[in-house]
A protein has these predicted regions:
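Amphipathic coiled-coil/heptad-repeat helices and related helical stalk/stem segments
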Residues: 17, 42, 73-77
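A short beta-turn/loop motif at secondary-structure boundaries
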Residues: 36-40
Length: 144
């Protein structure tokens, strides 16, 4: 591996958003907005429409061996789902994993170098939902 500049956490996040953006376009979603600087605890990173469905997309990106995880907690999860519901939208989670393709070991594959190719892991979308009995705010959230 060469000594190249590294991607920042924001660069990695933006790359994950770009990956999901391109996939949604392939799947016939019309992207209405994409915002790498959206507050991850309260705002979606992308809003899109397909047929009659408006959807908010929460996107997280991680470097090998990990993947993007929702780590903001239950309160943020519920806030994001409620925010989508208030706008008549569905809410989806997209987890993206990146591995430096120049790497041959786990350590090398975890280095987010600029200007290299990456192996991408994206298994699709997971709908973020709250159980029907969350009116009292005590029920746990569900990802289906």
């Amino acid at each position: 591996m060469q000594d190249r500049p590294l991607m920042s956490a924001r660069d990695i996040h933006a790359f994950g958003i770009e990956i999901v953006y391109k996939q949604l376009e392939k799947d016939s979603w019309a992207i209405e907005s994409a915002d790498v600087d959206a507050d991850i605890k309260s705002e979606p990173q992308m809003i899109a429409r397909k047929d009659d469905e408006l959807a908010f997309f929460v996107i997280r990106t991680g470097m090998h061996p990990g993947r993007g995880r929702f780590e903001e907690g239950q309160e943020a999860f519920e806030r994001l789902v409620h925010h989508a519901q208030q706008h008549g939208a569905s809410c989806y989670f997209a987890s993206v994993g990146l591995a430096n393709s120049d790497g041959t070991t786990d350590d090398e594959m975890s280095v987010p170098e600029k200007g290299v190719a990456f192996n991408i892991v994206f298994d699709g979308l997971v709908k973020m939902e709250l159980p029907a009995n969350t009116a009292n705010g005590n029920a746990p959230a569900a990802v289906s």
